[in-house]
Amino acid sequence: MNITEFEQRILDQKPVESGHYDSEYFTGDWRAEGNNYNLETRRQIEAKNPFLIRDVFQPKKVLDLGCGPGALMHLLWELGVNVEGIDFAESSRQLATPQVRDRITVGYVGDLGIKPANAYDLVICREVLEHLTVLQVKQTVANMVRMTSKFIYVTTRFHPNPSNLLDFTTQFDVDPTHITLLNKDMLRLMFVLEGCRSRPDLEARMDWGNKGRVLVLEKIASQP
């Protein structure tokens, strides 16, 4: 993909409307292998992830950006982690457990006014960026760096075989809202240009499933 093709693809992208993410999206039978957002289902899928988040990052205050119905938030809450969430869909609050419902703010993940700067020592953004346009990904990366004081932990779907740095694709066979699968190096570059450094040591600890979908970044202290 050359720069002209990249530009046109970006201009052609259309954001997914928040109303698409209703209860059917999160809990419907369309999800492969029962991969829905019921709490006990997520508990099995998450396995040791909540414990790793607590132990690897040792956070005092966590933001789950694009938290969905808050299943990971609930599992972290059970471990005594102080966690808040942001999600685009009103259904996320409705489907969340009572323990975390009031900790979820409904809003756009790229909104620079939604939370204060440096308010969290860990910002989590998992399985979110593939649902955004490339321009929205750029905005969301900047917002994550703004809101964290230390670490960012990201998982997303990446282009399985990019031709170059600019190349991105879709994954409609898995989810019709998977509109952006970036080159992994492109996403890392976005964070580096916002003033972060990669933490491959922490990525290795968090990617215990060896899926190759984890990024961990540390904000450089001099960044505002």
Language-model segments: residues:
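Conserved beta-strand signature within the Rossmann-like core of class I S-adenosyl-L-methionine
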Residues: 149-158
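Conserved N-terminal segment of class I S-adenosyl-L-methionine
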Residues: 1-118, 122-124, 135-142, 158, ...
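Short, well-ordered secondary-structure micro-motifs
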Residues: 96, 164-165
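Short catalytic micro-motifs in class I SAM-dependent methyltransferases
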Residues: 126-131
